[in-house]
Amino acid sequence: EVFESPAFSTHGYVMVDYIAGLQAQLPYNLRPFPVFTSAARNKLNAYLKEGGSLFLSGSYVGSDNVHTAADRDFIEDMLKFKYDGSARIDSTDTVNGLNMQFSIYRKPNAVHYATLAPDAILPASNKAFTAFAYGGGQGAGVAYQGKTYRTLSISFPFECIRDKDVRNQAMKAILGFLVKR
């Protein structure tokens, strides 16, 4: 809510880390809980056009953004990825990317929330590339390095990476990509 507020400015921020977790517009939600409200989408759009960098993570970053043309246009034209269905349940315990393979929380447990049905996403531009893939090969992350801005979107919550050292190593690599000019 603070991010969406007109009083909050992204000016001066080198990068935005947008954590969507399990956010999604679902029929059983007690209140609206989209990955992007129109206010957030507009603010991110302006921020990226000014040369910012965005790291987006969440289980439903694709599927929650196919309902309207504005949603689809934002993820495809600005973030440079497109929804490719749900990731197969038999291939999503492991993720490959950044020259490593790691496990994510997929089943309910006492330690951490789990991503039960994450999206699969693919590049929507020939200037974007698959940066992460689930164990079965479906796309789990798309990176884009444009002339004025950069994005890295992953279709699982970053915080669901099981191993702390791997999380730290992954974040270091992600930051290196997003803030390097």
Where are these regions (language model features)?
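Short, solvent-exposed loop/turn elements at domain surfaces
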Residues: 139-141, 160-165
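Residue-level detector of buried hydrophobic side-chain packing
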Residues: 44, 51-54, 144, 148, ...
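Active-site-proximal beta-strand elements of phosphoester/diester hydrolases
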Residues: 130-131, 151-157
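Aromatic-Pro/Gly-enriched surface loop or interdomain linker
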Residues: 1-22, 59, 144, 149, ...
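Helical hinge/lid and interdomain linker segments adjacent to catalytic or ligand-binding clefts
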Residues: 1-72
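An acidic, glycine-rich "communication" segment
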Residues: 56-143, 147
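Short amphipathic alpha-helical segments and helix-helix/interface helices
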Residues: 37-45, 118, 171-175
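A short, polar/proline- and glycine-enriched secondary-structure boundary/capping micro-motif
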Residues: 66-69, 162-166
